[in-house]
Each structure stands twice: as structure tokens, then as C-alpha cells.
Amino acid sequence: MTRFSKISGPVDELEIVLDDDDQRDSEGPDVQKEEAAIAQALRRLATRAMGLTGADIERVVREARLKARREQRRLTYADIESGIRGHRPQVPYDVRWRYAIHESGHAIVHHALRLGSIKGLTIDTNDGGHNALTFATGTPDTVEWYGRLLAMLMAGRAAELIVLKTVSAGSGGAEQSDLARATRIALDMEQALGFGGRNPLLYLEHKDPTAILSRDADLAKRVHQRLEFAQARATEVIFERRAAFDRLVRALFDAQALDGDAVMDILAPTS
């Protein structure tokens, strides 16, 4: 599942955002080093926790605190990380491999098309992978930008087809799925954003995309063509950066969660 700022995800998900403040030059190097280590640990925890609700995390922290108290010691970051991982059932090998491929596809296309930064990826869940992506501010909302956005949304499915030759239902099946979001955006491009191939000056509001696409076969065809083009573009990007993509898949599969810095260490040579 793709989480990003312009299209909101489930309201009960908890996202931890850390501010990188590189201007604390008034403090000594030891303090800065300690704060950097703390920030790195928190980023790791935030990445591990993607997909959990606030109530889930509250329960994890409470149980970790009780465990530390019983052992008469202080609570550590490792306790919380262990609690997060213990909260989730073990994901089968083949499913975890598919998750890693899918999320790496999103990440490689997001980075290659310069949509913004990557805060983290995780496949340490039993309900699909999760990623935290941000988008550069101040970019014009042109048809080209929306085309890149669609390519990123279709990239998980494209990656599965490239590597596994089959696709799972993970990119669809829910209101906040990749396919659902991509369909809504492509429909907006046709009817509400002024990019349509027919009557582009009309603003046609639609509260039920399923209903309107089911009734209008021609509109459904135009929307589907946009999605096909986006998937083809994502496929091309992944092939062009196949070496970096393969490295990211392996690293994500092994670690099960990577923060943004770890992802960029892998993708940076392709910038």
C-alpha cells in the first residue's frame, strides 16, 4: 500500500515524522552524535510501525514497558522494536518476497521520476507492504506530473509482472489500494482537471467512480488507457534501473523494514 501526502490514507494509521535539524552546531560533537543515534533509532521504529494503528502502538509500548519493569531495567528501543515484530504473525517466504518486489517497484519509480523523498519501506506485516513517500512541494500540477504519479502507483503491479510474471490482488481490492487511487486520479484527469481527451473544459464532478465508469464504456476505456500507459512507463523505468531495483528487493526482503536513509544508500547511485 502506498501512503503519501496528496492522497490521504486510513485516518487511524500513525505516522511518525522526524525533523532533521542539521543546524545544531552550538552543541558538542558527542551530543550531536548521541542525538543522531536516537533519531536513527526512532526512524527505524517508525518504519517498523508503518501500517499499525495508534492503538496497536500504544499496546506494544505498554507491553514492552511491563516486560522491562518485570526484568527490573529501563525500557529500550530494542524492546519496542521486538514488540512491534512480535505483534505481527510471520509472513510466509513467498508472500514476503512478493511484498518486497511490489514495494521496491513503488520506491524505484518514485525516486527515478523525482516525485519526492522516501521515508521508509516495510514488508513486516500480514496485510501487504507499506511505504511512506513524500512529494516535493511547489511543483506544478500539470498533466505530466499526474502522469508520473500514476506511473508510481502502477509500479508495484509492474514490478510483480516483471519478476514473477503474475500479479496478486495486493494492488487492488480496497478503496485505498493502488488501483483504486490510480483509477480515481485518471478519472479526475478525464473529467475534472482539464486534461480530458473529450470536452476538457468541462468540470464534471463524480462522487461514485464505480457507477460512472460502469455506465460509460467510452470513458472507462479512456481511463483504462491512462492506467495502461502508466504501467508501461513504470515497467520501462524499472527495467532501466534493474540493478538498483534488484538490490533494493534483496535488502528489503532480508531486513523486512528499511528507513529512508537505507533506501537512498541503495538508490543513490542511480540518481
Positions of PLM-derived features:
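Short conserved motifs of the RecA-like P-loop NTPase core
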Residues: 13-21, 25-51, 78-91
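A general structural signal marking secondary-structure boundaries and capping sites
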Residues: 4, 8, 68-71, 157, ...
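Soluble catalytic regions of large protease machineries
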Residues: 18, 94-101, 107-271
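A general structural motif at alpha-helix termini
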Residues: 46, 61, 84, 249, ...
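AAA+ ATPase "lid" subdomain C-terminal helix
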Residues: 43-75, 88-91, 107-119, 190-196, ...
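Non-catalytic accessory segments flanking P-loop/AAA+ NTPase cores
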Residues: 1-33, 59-62, 69, 75
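Hydrophobic aliphatic residues
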Residues: 4-8, 84, 88, 154, ...
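Alpha-helix N-cap and coil->helix boundary residues
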Residues: 37-41, 59, 75, 79, ...
